[in-house]
Amino acid sequence: ANAALGRHDRPPFRRGWRLDRRVMAETAGRIIEDFGVSPRRLDLTARGFSGGNQQRFVAGRELACAPPLLIAVHPTRGVDLLATRFIHERILAERDRGTAILLVSADLTELRSLSDRLLILYRGRVAYEAARSEIDHARLHRALLGLGAP
């Protein structure tokens, strides 16, 4: 059922008044396979997976539907380096496919490597904004500390 979360009310997961469990299982199986979720068992609930594998599954579920806008909030928190690299590659592939991506992260390295444009918010206001190629590291770090913010 986790594979259909947020989309359970429409096809292909819903048929009339009922959920199509076969389609949900097939989708979950594809996510588990494509995103390297371990253990590769469809009978486990979300609690049966480690935090990192739960995160892999969520990333897979959200990317599986080819969204026009992807809001990724701490997409690699709690995952190992291999999973982080894999999720980063998937996010970049989505960007290359034309998906608009809003990435929220406390990991500045992640933000710099994945973002075309960087916005730093401080107390709800934009404290710094720049294209990746135009980042002024001194101003960026001041903004991160709340120095010189509006």
Regions from the language model: what does each represent?
Residues 1-150:
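Glycine-rich phosphate-binding loops of nucleotide-dependent enzymes
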